[in-house]
Structures are given as structure tokens and as C-alpha cells.
């Protein structure tokens, strides 16, 4: 009976070899990528984004002297000393006399609309030999009016004969009048008129005094 095992091995050897060849061929096709399929794709090659800008510009009444927010660090210019809204020390005031009147223009030359607009008066400080407090005797009347196409709109009063030391921490100009918010424009603006007058009740204690008070305009973007 020794011949039987040899015949059995001979009968199945070709089948095993064939199966091995088929597996090798399939594996080879898979590895070399010769098997293919339909595909589809889209590449969006132009995906961009940008931010808008808020740029405040203040000029004198003639539009010849100008300060820009971009002149300072972080779009906040803190050294605009060329535009004096209280009239300066040359035009000296007397009790109940004529006021110092100054006008300025506020523009938004950026690309983003102004959503909030405030004016923050700083601390009024006096100097001079008098013993009285001139900050409490000088009164400010402030109005604003939009100017579109060279034509001024209706003026709105923001302060009406308020003492400089009582102006408060901040004035919400948009809340007072949305028409006084500068548009996004290089030509249209808001005109602010500052009128500073010495109270008729002022006495000799405020003679030979002067005052100084910083004013901070702030735009907030939409």
C-alpha cells in the first residue's frame, strides 16, 4: 500500500500551484494599481477674507489742519494738539461777554460703518494766580450737524451751557442723535460747534487764569 500516498500528492499538486498563481496575479494587479474606478473632484483655489477699517479724521473749520487716528499706535492718535476747540488763550473771555466759537469736522474715511460714537471729556485743570476755579465758571455749549453734499442738516445740541468741570465722563453722541454719526465717506462729515463762554457771575477770583481739558472722540465699528 505505499504507492497510494504518492498518487494523492501528485493529483493535488497542480491545483495548489494554479491557486497560488491566481492569488499572486490578483495581488500584483492590486499593488500596481492597474485596477481603476471613476472619480470626481473640485478644488476651490480662491478662498479669501478681509477686514474692514475705521479711520477717524478731524479737521479744523477750513479743512486745512487735520488729525488722523492712524497717526497713532493702534489707530488711536493721542497728540492732536493743533486743533483747539476752546478757542485758545489769545481770545480772552470776560464775564457774560462774547464766547469763543470753534468748529471742527469729523469724518469716517474707513470702510466700516460707525456703530457707536462717544466724546469723553477729561479732567479740566486750571492754572494762574487767581484763587477761584475757572473750570466751574467756563460754560460749554456744543452742537452737531451732519453735512451732506456741502449742505448742513438740522443742528442738535449736545451740551447747553454746561460748566467744563461738570461735563461728565462720556457723551454718547449716537444716542443723542444718530444724524451726528459720520458716514463712511471722504466728503460728507459731521460739523461740531464749540462755544465757550465765561459765566456772567464770574468774579475777580478767576482773573488771569487759564484752563486745559482733553477731549477724546471714539468710533466703534459695526
Cite the ranges covered by each PLM segment.
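Long, small/polar-residue-biased beta-strand-and-loop interaction regions
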Residues: 2-222
Amino acid at each position: 500500500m505505499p504507492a497510494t500516498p504518492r498518487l494523492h500528492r501528485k493529483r493535488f499538486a497542480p491545483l495548489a500551484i494554479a491557486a497560488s498563481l491566481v492569488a499572486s496575479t490578483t495581488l500584483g494587479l492590486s499593488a500596481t494599481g492597474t485596477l481603476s474606478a471613476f472619480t470626481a473632484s473640485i478644488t476651490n483655489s480662491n478662498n479669501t477674507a478681509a477686514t474692514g477699517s475705521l479711520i477717524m479724521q478731524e479737521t479744523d473749520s477750513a479743512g486745512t489742519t487735520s488729525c488722523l487716528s492712524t497717526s497713532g499706535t493702534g489707530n488711536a492718535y493721542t497728540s492732536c494738539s493743533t486743533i483747539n476747540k476752546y478757542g485758545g488763550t489769545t481770545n480772552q473771555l470776560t464775564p457774560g461777554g462774547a464766547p469763543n466759537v470753534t468748529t471742527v469736522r469729523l469724518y469716517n474715511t474707513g470702510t466700516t460703518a460707525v456703530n457707536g460714537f462717544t466724546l469723553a471729556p477729561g479732567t479740566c485743570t486750571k492754572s494762574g494766580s487767581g484763587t477761584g476755579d475757572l473750570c466751574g465758571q467756563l460754560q460749554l455749549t456744543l452742537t452737531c450737524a451732519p453735512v451732506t453734499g456741502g449742505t448742513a442738516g438740522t443742528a442738535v445740541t449736545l451740551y447747553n451751557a454746561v460748566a467744563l468741570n461738570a461735563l461728565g465722563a462720556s457723551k454718547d453722541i449716537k444716542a443723542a442723535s444718530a444724524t451726528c454719526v459720520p458716514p463712511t465717506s471722504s466728503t460728507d462729515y459731521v460739523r461740531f460747534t464749540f462755544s465757550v463762554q465765561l459765566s456772567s457771575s464770574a468774579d475777580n477770583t478767576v482773573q488771569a487764569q487759564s484752563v486745559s481739558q482733553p477731549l477724546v472722540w471714539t468710533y466703534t465699528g459695526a
